[in-house]
């Protein structure tokens, strides 16, 4: 479907934006992934997102494909990583944060500001729209605790590798924002 939608946009002369994910990478590199690095998603989710990227760019070479990993509040404050940690910190519940799962999550408000900038700069092709500072899920939770004035000791360090239910995820999915910074003309926070 994404390829079909991208083609229709191209026929109409409309800009097409496709959101993808950091999960297109296998997560085995300690370095930040660039847009040109080989993908190799271990999960069906990442594989299908990569197939969507390819279909979109094949159908519409002017399309903007944004690989992202974002956080924000869900409508019911019960679905995302921000909700998980904030609710636990407010309730005084012990939680586990994975030290070996590193991502470049961007706040959803910043994501949309950067989307507008990328569109205004007439970007096309693949860009990484994420934070410039990768964090482990543990470090994310601790940073949130400090921002909330909550007890960071409620977050215990754990390992994704010990959680068999999540074993198909790459462990280091930090993405480079160099290409996006060049497009928008300023550093990405």
Q: Which positions does each model-derived feature cover?
A:
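C-terminal amphipathic/interface module of NAD(P)-dependent oxidoreductases
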Residues: 153, 168-189
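Helix C-cap/helix->beta junction micro-motif
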Residues: 8-12, 59, 148
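Catalytic helix-loop patch of NAD(P)-dependent Rossmann-fold dehydrogenases
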Residues: 15, 24-66, 70-72
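Mid/C-terminal beta-alpha module of Rossmann-like enzyme folds, strongest
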Residues: 114, 121-172
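Conserved internal alpha-helix within the Rossmann fold of NAD(P)-dependent oxidoreductases
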Residues: 2-5, 53, 115
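Glycine-rich Rossmann NAD(P)(H)-binding loop
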Residues: 74, 96-102, 127-135, 183
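NAD(P)-cofactor binding segment of oxidoreductase domains
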Residues: 1-17
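NAD(P)-dependent short-chain dehydrogenase/reductase
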Residues: 54-103, 108-110
């Amino acid at each position: 479907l994404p390829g079909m939608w991208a083609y229709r946009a191209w026929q109409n002369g409309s800009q097409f934006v496709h959101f993808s994910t950091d999960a297109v990478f296998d997560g085995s590199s300690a370095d930040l992934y660039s847009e040109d690095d080989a993908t190799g998603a271990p999960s069906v989710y990442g594989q299908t997102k990569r197939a969507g990227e390819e279909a979109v760019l094949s159908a519409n070479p002017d399309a903007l494909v944004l690989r992202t990993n974002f956080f924000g509040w869900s409508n019911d404050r019960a679905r995302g990583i921000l909700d998980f940690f904030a609710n636990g910190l407010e309730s005084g519940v012990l939680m586990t944060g994975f030290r070996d799962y590193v991502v470049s999550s961007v706040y959803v408000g910043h994501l949309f500001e950067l989307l507008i900038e990328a569109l205004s700069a007439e970007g096309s092709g693949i860009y990484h729209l994420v934070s410039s500072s990768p964090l482990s899920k543990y470090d994310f939770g601790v940073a949130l605790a400090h921002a909330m004035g909550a007890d960071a000791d409620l977050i215990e360090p754990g390992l994704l590798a010990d959680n068999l239910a999540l074993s198909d995820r790459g462990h280091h999915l930090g993405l480079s924002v160099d290409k996006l910074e060049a497009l928008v003309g300023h550093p990405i926070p």
